[in-house]
């Protein structure tokens, strides 16, 4: 709708240029948000849903149950809840196997509700909490953490805890008072992958394997249109090493 731009830009060419730029940025934001949702689903939902890919939906668990640990009493003042977390991390090492465990560079806990509150304020572990800056992450969750300063994060004994209570798209996978323990892996291990593909909407453009493809086309009357397509497939190769639990 060029009418809204023509009030500020009397020159029609200028108005069309600004409109195209605005639509281009809006398209990119929309597609980036969609990619982030699918990365979360691959990492914490352990699947990829697809309406168009020839292989259909991908279940990284291949029908198996996800790895869980017993509920943890984060309100306990007699038994340190962090001991249960360390036990869960050891279970994660078993699921990874010795080869991949050696390539683990860190651990991130996505926690919500009572789990997040308990990890940050339980008196038995409060002296272990050291508030830090943005969590360092790699692979799939680089986009989720590093580019989202809204996430509250802190450190407990070398483990990064991220409070995601206010992010329903993540809480939907871990539960309102749940948590997920995710290993941060060396990129060379290729445990988390984001494959990019070619575009299909244009006969000549978009033939490189990149995440986003965007084209500017004009109709017979030279009115421009912005076309954006995103071709990607996130892959989680260590779904059993993502440990899930909840607050008791």
List where the protein language model places each region.
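Flexible, active-site-adjacent loop/turn segments at secondary-structure boundaries
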Residues: 46, 56-59, 72, 117, ...
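Generic serine detector
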Residues: 6, 13, 24, 30, ...
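A contiguous, surface-oriented mixed alpha/beta subdomain in the mid-to-C-terminal portion of proteins
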Residues: 73, 79-172
